[in-house]
């Protein structure tokens, strides 16, 4: 399959630079996987689409202020984007500079350049950086870091983004991008879902900056997926198996929840799904056999991205590309701060290729 098969025309005006004033009032495009039928509504229509006993699986990662500005001690300006926190002193990061720093290079970070760090090693495209500061890494990031808004949101981050670019149930710091399907859930909607008897479970996948990296090969089978850390604890496994046993659906909130659950299913030795704690490089594209997910809530993704490939593997290639064409025509808002889709599984998708 060619990467260009997943391209579509997107006017710049449809890229959302700010979220809706009210989280749950975004638009919702529903795609019936087996038939391709589309219906238009608002996000709170989920209440009518879910049945008592259905299980929603959320990603409770929390976005860290992962973008740092400063300079090398020798003078050159740098921008640091944390990929992951290694421990209380060290990070793995992307560094943008006129000349890549060498091991031993001292970095002066923050507006007043008061935070000192050392680049200690290079791992491929990533740099290991150690802070020379008594505070834990997370405290330093909270003090001097900027929210790492995606590259297509073409504006500086604002104070409000510290909460807006965060799900209301975020709990475990470590992501450098929000699991954006979850941004549409507010407390009143969560309460209404619970009242209806909708079950909820929480995985953790710390979204890395790799989620925004373009696919740089022509043939998607040649793409090497970036690695991200995921946790699927026993209580999630129990909730999934219980939902399946009673004939209810497992509904992933976002592609990160999909990748967490499907990673746990792939690694399972005997049962449908087993607990999973570790890095995942799962790459889902047409031809993939889904094991756990019955429905998916997700935002609209970039052309030629691994995420539109994941959706195509779930709903079917033709149904997905038609839904995107319709979304553009109907002026839905795209990407992280944009509108959402509710998609049910198409069992024929596994047989469909572009």
UniProtKB/Swiss-Prot annotation:
GO cellular component annotations of the record: cytoplasm
EC class: transferase
InterPro entries assigned: QueA, QueA_dom1, QueA_dom2, QueA_sf
A biological process from GO: tRNA wobble guanine modification
Pfam families named in the record: Queuosine_synth (PF02547)
EC annotation from Swiss-Prot or TrEMBL: 2.4.99.17
Localisation: Cytoplasm
Subunit-level organization: Monomer.
Record-linked NCBIfam families: PRK00147.1, queA
Protein name in UniProt: S-adenosylmethionine:tRNA ribosyltransferase-isomerase
UniProt source species: Salmonella schwarzengrund (strain CVM19633)
Gene that specifies this protein: queA
């Amino acid at each position: 399959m060619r990467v260009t098969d997943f391209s579509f025309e997107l006017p710049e005006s449809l890229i959302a630079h700010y979220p809706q004033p009210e989280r749950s009032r975004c638009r919702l495009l529903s795609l019936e996987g087996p038939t391709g039928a589309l219906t238009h509504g608002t996000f709170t229509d989920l209440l009518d689409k879910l049945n008592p006993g259905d299980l929603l699986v959320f990603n409770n990662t929390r976005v860290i202020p992962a973008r740092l500005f400063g300079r090398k001690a020798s003078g050159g300006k740098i921008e640091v984007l944390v990929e992951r926190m290694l421990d209380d002193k060290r990070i793995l990061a992307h560094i943008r500079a006129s000349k890549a720093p060498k091991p031993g290079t001292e970095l002066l970070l923050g507006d007043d350049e008061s935070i000192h760090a050392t680049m200690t090693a290079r791992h491929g495209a990533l740099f290991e950086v150690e802070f020379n500061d008594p505070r834990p890494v997370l405290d330093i990031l909270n003090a001097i870091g900027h929210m790492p808004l995606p590259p297509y949101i073409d504006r500086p981050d604002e104070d409000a983004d510290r909460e807006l670019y965060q799900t209301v149930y975020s709990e475990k710091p470590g992501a450098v991008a929000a699991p954006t399907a979850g941004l549409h859930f507010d407390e009143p909607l969560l309460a209404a879902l619970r009242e209806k008897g909708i079950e909820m479970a929480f995985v953790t996948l710390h979204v890395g900056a790799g989620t925004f990296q373009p696919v740089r090969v022509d043939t998607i089978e040649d793409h090497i997926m970036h690695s991200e850390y995921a946790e699927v604890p026993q209580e999630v496994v129990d909730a999934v198996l219980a939902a399946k046993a009673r004939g209810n659906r497992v509904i992933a909130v976002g592609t990160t929840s999909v990748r967490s659950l499907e990673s746990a299913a792939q690694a399972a030795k005997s049962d449908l799904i087993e607990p999973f704690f570790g890095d995942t490089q799962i790459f889902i594209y047409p031809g993939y056999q889904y094991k756990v997910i019955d429905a998916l809530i997700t935002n609209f993704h970039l052309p030629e991205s691994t995420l539109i490939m994941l959706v195509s593997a779930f709903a079917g290639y033709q149904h997905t590309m038609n839904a995107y064409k319709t979304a553009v025509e109907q002026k839905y808002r795209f990407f992280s701060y944009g509108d959402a889709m509710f998609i049910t599984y198409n069992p024929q998708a596994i047989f469909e290729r572009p």
